[in-house]
């Protein structure tokens, strides 16, 4: 769960590729991006591009792919099954942006993106053969499921005003939740993130715990 949810999703797809919040050595980037394949949503390129070009550009407005204004379950899970978001937000300008960062034109990352299902199923099968069904189920399948639930919880709850507090008057409805932040690797310091979207840490106060921010400091060394 730590490798998939924290290293792969929160740090890799979200802060590193999605927001260019920090830099790291290439070999660490490779490991981090490999972990991101087990995100529970699917292919890695679309998630990054939709999040950046759709959600942050139109947060809680028309065009936001996963705003709870369209309903809780839409924001929680079903949005990424709607083809229109892929059509609207994956355009040439966005592709060029990520080509410059060596993401979508990297042959290895193209392989991860195009074969994400085979990699997920293959890893589960290999873990079963080598270590037994317990490792496959509780180690891999649960890790993928927990990562999906983690990210879905952030996208749904963190834009309800009753769920937390705001440090900044942003144009969206994002809020922070200290307890939720501990459980989601720092991602529920969401109002802070929408104010400083390219910061490597979402914490703005000693009482706001951002595990991902701590891990990033270690990865940069």
Segments and roles (model prediction):
Residues 51, 191-194:
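Acidic active-site catalytic centers that drive phospho-/nucleotidyl reactions
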Residues 98-107, 163-189, 196:
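Active-site-proximal inter-transmembrane loops
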Residues 1-153, 157-158, 198-221:
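Non-catalytic, topology-defining segments of multipass membrane proteins
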């Amino acid at each position: 769960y730590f490798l998939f949810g924290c290293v792969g999703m929160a740090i890799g797809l979200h802060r590193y590729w999605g927001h260019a919040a920090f830099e790291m050595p290439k070999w660490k980037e490779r490991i981090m991006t490999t972990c991101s394949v087990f995100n529970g949503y699917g292919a890695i390129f679309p998630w990054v591009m939709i999040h950046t070009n759709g959600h942050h550009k139109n947060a809680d407005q028309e065009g936001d792919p996963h705003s709870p204004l369209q309903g809780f379950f839409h924001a929680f899970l079903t949005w990424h099954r709607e083809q229109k978001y892929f059509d609207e937000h994956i355009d040439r300008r966005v592709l060029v942006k990520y080509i410059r960062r060596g993401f979508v034109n990297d042959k290895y990352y193209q392989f991860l993106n195009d074969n994400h299902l085979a990699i997920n199923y293959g890893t589960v099968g290999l873990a079963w053969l080598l270590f037994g069904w317990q490792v496959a189920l509780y180690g891999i399948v649960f890790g993928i499921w927990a990562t999906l639930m983690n990210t879905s919880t952030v996208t749904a709850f963190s834009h309800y005003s009753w769920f937390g507090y705001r440090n900044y008057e942003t144009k969206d409805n994002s809020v922070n939740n200290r307890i939720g932040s501990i459980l989601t690797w720092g991602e529920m310091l969401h109002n802070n993130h929408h104010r400083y979207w390219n910061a490597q840490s979402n914490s703005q106060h000693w009482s706001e715990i951002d595990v991902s921010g701590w891990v990033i400091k270690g990865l940069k060394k």
